[in-house]
Amino acid sequence: MKVAIVGASGAVGQEFLRVLEERKFPMDDLVLFGSERSAGRKYTFNGKEYEVKLLQHNDDFKDVDIAFTSAGAGISKEFAEDITKYGAVMIDNSSAFRMDENVPLVVPECNAEDALERPRGIIANPNCTTIMMVVVLQPLEQISHIRRIHIASYQSASGAGAAAMAELQQQYAEIIEGKPVTVKKFPHQLAYNVIPQIDVFQPNGYTKEEMKMFNETRKIMHSDVKCSAMCVRVSSLRAHSESVWIETERPISVEEAQKALAAAPGVTLRDDPANLVYPMPLETAGKDDIYVGRIRKDIADENGLTFWLSGDQIRKGAALNAVQIAEYLIKSGNVR
């Protein structure tokens, strides 16, 4: 089994290396690819040093079985044919192919079997906020069909990249030192602030990030569920959180929800508010599971349930989800 990582020097690329090593992914060889800026860098994996190769239009993927790509939508579109033409499975972390009808959009806890049918040889990894939410929604959907979802996301600085996280830390330092605040990676100062905008605004008034949650949730869950999101950038460093309201066909009790979520794969129940136990980014950063708590009946809707979740958007929201897809393909004998 030969594995490639495209975008190996980025935050998600580095997380791929950690996740693959931690999970003892069954592979015989590894090749790393990057831009001119990162080509030549060296990284250690399982005690062996690997040098990043320059990504080019050639036959470098001829012997690759699985390629994890995380270098942006433009690169994914440009190199998709080079990556897949000899039979490699491309598991793409960008937005390039998520809504392509010939590309499955997969969260293994929800729709792993969709990964087995991939006409273009590509499997898309959903947006991080979508992944985190549907992992929690799936066990509730099995109790009663979800008709409507309202989400407010609270997304950390690192969701905008490593440079954005560094800028937030710099902003705090500049404020303390009485210096002018540097604002380059965000629309406004993020330190001591929240920004109700992630990505660009669309004609309907929603942002691109918010529309991703609408479209991707429906595709993953094979559902016509109505879904409305408000995505907000907050001044935590790593791990996203979401406040979620759902309306189901029949009422789901708090006890039913807790029991289903406690048994669900990829979910950790942290729901004891009387003792100040609930999910927070400080505890979920670096963890694989999505943590859920504050589960309660919606007092405005007898068929409503509301809860709070938090998870590491770089792990389950990106690298881990992609690796789990690959593990499912191997287990299913669906890789050459």
Give names to the regions the model predicted.
Residues 1-190, 226, 259, 290-291, ...:
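N-terminal Rossmann-like NAD(P) cofactor-binding subdomain of oxidoreductases
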